[in-house]
Amino acid sequence: SKLTTPESNDLNKMLNQMNLAGCDFSVMEVSSHSLALKRVHGLHFSFAVFTNLTPEHLDFHGDFENYLTAKKILFDTLPVSSSAIYNIDDLHSIDVVKDCPSLKYSFGTKSDSQFKISEINCDLTGTSFTINYENKNYALRTSLVGDFNAYNAAGAFATAKLSGLKDEVIAAGIATTPQVPGRFEILS
């Protein structure tokens, strides 16, 4: 798609094709634009992950408050049976999830994180880090470079863990996630 989140007709067509092909899960990035324009209106998400909020897209939203309000739409409309997973280290995360009716799970480096990130180490081949969840440490590595990718992977880890996936499947998925062309890509 040319858009981060496709137009609703295109998105529903893709999701239907995936369903007909036997797909049980879909993972997608839901942009603030798509929330404001109701591209995902009517979809019921089992999980939503909030990674961070920085002053972007103000040309579209007009100001930071409108941008924050757009981001909140996904969380405010989650079904009670869903889970909201959020980066507790982000200054705006509490504002984003405060009105969310679903279960809430935090990730980050703060001591009160439910999925606590520690020991982040980056080099040109990727990022390694540890997540502590329910008093168990999980040593993880991704080929994606940067502390922010440890945070992104922690959100994915939390989602997968809460979905009931096996630890080795989660670790393998994080380890084999390919680089996205043009996104903090290492060039040789």
Residue ranges of predicted features:
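Short, flexible, glycine-rich and Lys/Arg-enriched loop motifs at helix boundaries
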Residues: 1-2, 42
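Conserved nucleotide-sensing/catalytic segment adjacent to the nucleotide-binding pocket
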Residues: 2-31
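Short hydrophobic/charged patches on amphipathic alpha-helices used for structural packing
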Residues: 15-16, 37, 72
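Acidic, Mg2+-coordinating active-site environments of NTP-dependent enzymes
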Residues: 19-23, 27, 45-188
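Conserved helix/coil segment N-terminal to the catalytic DExD/H
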Residues: 34-41
